[in-house]
Amino acid sequence: MAEEYKNNVPEHETPTVATEESPATTTEVTDRGLFDFLGKKEEEVKPQETTTLESEFDHKAQISEPELAAEHEEVKENKITLLEELQEKTEEDEENKPSVIEKLHRSNSSSSSSSDEEGEEKKEKKKKIVEGEEDKKGLVEKIKEKLPGHHDKTAEDDVPVSTTIPVPVSESVVEHDHPEEEKKGLVEKIKEKLPGHHDEKAEDSPAVTSTPLVVTEHPVEPTTELPVEHPEEKKGILEKIKEKLPGYHAKTTEEEVKKEKESDD
């Protein structure tokens, strides 16, 4: 600053310093005349110009330095604020992470609970469907029971079936005092008429013995009177009935032939 002040001082205020100059130098200065005057002015102008330029540069530097410093400080502050914001964001993200995990857990739990509820609803629907089908079956059975003829069919299915075959009874059959034998004979006839019964009887049981037929030489004349009960005639009628049954005639003919031979002897 002192140098600048010295440079800025005008020429008329500069102190004069007494110097001992030789007479030769004074004569040279006076001899040159105008040329010396111009040369001195040029020399004097140059340091003033440099001083003004330096002062302007220093002034600009002084003005620009605080501006740059302020800008630099603002940049630093901005950087600090940005860093703080980033740190806050990271902290918020870290704080939000467990909340996201909790949300996932909640969603999983809600989905599992919803799936459980759906499973229970499906089970209830299945139960209702089964119950409805059972109710329908019960109603159908009740309706069938109310229908005519349904009860008889169920009874027939439960009770074993017994078939009865009508036996042709001749008009000449006479009542006798042995009803048990007649019953046995009728049962045997019915069994013989059943399919497959005759073969089993032939294999398991021995040859059936039947009463011989009584052959009369003189035919009996028809009379209007009631016939007298004779056990031989009764047996003959039963044998005739047996002969009419299928599967019985062959055995009776063979036995009759044998009996005729024995009677001839």
UniProtKB/Swiss-Prot annotation:
It comes from the Eukaryota. The modification Phosphoserine is found at S64. The modification Phosphothreonine is found at T90. Coiled coil: none annotated. Residues 1-14, 29-47, 69-79, 96-105, 129-156, 173-204, 227-265 have a biased composition (Basic and acidic residues). Residues 16-28 have a biased composition (Polar residues). Residues 160-172 have a biased composition (Low complexity). Keywords: Acetylation, Phosphoprotein, Repeat, Stress response. The modification N-acetylalanine is found at A2. Belongs to the plant dehydrin family. This is Dehydrin COR47. It comes from Arabidopsis thaliana. The gene is COR47.
